Amino acid sequence: AHIIDKVEDKSRVGVCIDTAHTLAAGYEIRTEESFKNTFRAFDEIIGFNYLKGMHINDSKKEVGTKVDRHDSIGEGVMGMLLFEMIMKDDRFNNMPLILETPVEELWSVEIKMLYKLK
């Protein structure tokens, strides 16, 4: 928010959230309540209008560890509810959701799995 405040032409500003980074930084997002609270706080502090994309991945590490270790969808500590909430949230409909998981051979399976959650 401090950086955005300093930018004169805010139409050129965008933010990308990474699901594993969010969890590693200490933001719990795996329950309906924590998901709503985290994105409510994001909107209040930064502004949801600045969210232009999201990196989608599971995490090998728990909340607050400050360790970024991406995992395949459904294979880490995130749980499928998080991904279901993202896929069903209309705010993300026209936003790039970039799969950033470690096993290339699983990408097509993971993409199909995410679409089935919609």
Language model features with spans:
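Acidic/histidine-rich catalytic cores of soluble enzymes
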Residues: 1-71
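C-terminal helical cap(s) of enzyme catalytic domains, especially alpha/beta-barrels
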Residues: 104-118
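Acidic carboxylate-rich catalytic motifs and surrounding loops in phosphoryl-/glycosyl-chemistry enzymes
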Residues: 55-58, 99-103
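A short, acidic, amphipathic alpha-helical segment used as a generic capping/interface helix at domain edges
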Residues: 36-45, 77-89
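Generic structural signal for well-ordered alpha-helices
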Residues: 1-4, 39-40, 80-84, 111-115
